[in-house]
């Protein structure tokens, strides 16, 4: 864990050989049952799961744990303007086991915040611009006991964490497929860095072969 009291961030994703996490229609079904069980096992080891609002709007996930015993964790949604529906699974499904935090900006109207709070959702505000300030947000999450987070996308949120150099570890499952398409969703999107020298560096720790699937585990490199 870092000394500056930020949660340990693990980016977890499954992608195709050509780096896509979803097809051009948004179909994200890449992981097989074995990988899903491994992902759910990994979820039991963290204090929170984080996704962006687009993941909620497109997939409406429950962000819960199957296959393994557990004590629950926080579901954390980055949603600058509080736009996800109040009947989303991430809000309505088993909130007593998986309490939900939504991270918005400081400009979010109090009236809108109250709509979510009456549905047992805690709102944390960070940043005065159009986007949530992740650098300021993470210490706030640490202070309430969230010391490790599994980041599960989507691509825009992945970029925000990469841009701000907040990723500590990466776990990638690579499926033996090529989906193609300029409109298919890549692992990391956003504006990207202008020069390769700006790219974030990671050190390969482990390679796991399973049938034609490969799991790659990386940790941040400070070199």
Language model features with spans:
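Enzymes that bind and transform nitrogen-containing heteroaromatic metabolites
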Residues: 1-223
């Amino acid at each position: 864990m870092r000394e500056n009291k930020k949660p340990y961030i693990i980016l977890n994703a499954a992608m195709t050989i050509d780096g896509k996490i979803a097809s051009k229609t948004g179909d994200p079904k890449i992981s097989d049952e074995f990988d899903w069980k491994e992902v759910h096992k990994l979820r039991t080891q963290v204090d929170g799961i984080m996704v962006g609002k687009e993941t909620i709007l497109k997939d409406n996930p429950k962000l819960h744990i199957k296959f393994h015993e557990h004590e629950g964790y926080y579901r954390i949604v980055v949603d600058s303007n509080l736009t996800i529906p109040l009947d989303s699974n991430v809000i309505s499904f088993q909130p007593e086991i998986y309490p939900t935090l939504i991270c918005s900006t400081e400009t979010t109207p109090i009236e809108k915040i109250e709509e979510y709070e009456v549905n047992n959702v805690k709102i944390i505000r960070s940043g005065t611009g159009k986007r949530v300030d992740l650098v300021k947000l993470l210490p706030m999450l640490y202070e309430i006991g969230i010391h490790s987070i599994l980041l599960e996308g989507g691509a825009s949120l992945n970029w925000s964490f990469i841009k701000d150099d907040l990723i500590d570890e990466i776990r990638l499952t690579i499926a033996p497929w090529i989906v193609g398409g300029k409109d298919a969703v890549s692992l990391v999107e956003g504006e990207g860095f202008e020069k390769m020298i700006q790219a974030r560096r990671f050190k390969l720790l482990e390679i796991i072969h399973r049938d034609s699937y490969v799991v790659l585990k990386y940790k941040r490199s400070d070199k």
